């Protein structure tokens, strides 16, 4: 079922290109290139922006909010016309938004929100409703386990609005079946490795787990590896969000159960359209 962000050292990982609009510059600070969705989005955004003849500089924050804020400050110093990001943190990214506002520049936030953004006319959010992705997971669980189930919930970054919204959507959908219980919640930080190790520990802690629900596909793919090693892939369902190529292949192979699509290509193309305006 399909319904669905960056690592850096002290130096910027950046690339830029120009095809005719050499005086117009877009800066994009990626959340983390190690997160499958973000890596894919970065590529789509760069291609879609360059296709319009717009110069774009792309950096990788490596999941570090302070690094990302610094990168956006750098874009402003470089006289960028637009700054944009898959913002790392709902509150932690406020300094970057304020810097853009002080410079009179548009701030385009992809996939994730920034607190106070709606109070700035130059703030633009591009992304699908994350609450809907969580809702899709919850609705699937209600259909798959009409008599109830015991599930674990593996989350992403705790103060990232996309994950707050995904949890809200899941919880709302699960109200339809109060017999589906969330045994516990663990932060696996969008990491396949952490998803795997957390699942391994959980298998030792709980006698009965019907499903492990993850807020992104990377964590879910780690869970799949843990269940395969333990011989429990047939008895525990695994749900993700993003619709990554690896997740779709895992579903096709009969491993992951479902994912909710985040359409990176469509969102990137929408961003390029905004840059052009």
Place the predicted regions along the sequence by residue.
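A residue-level marker of the well-folded mature domains of exported/periplasmic proteins
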Residues: 3-277
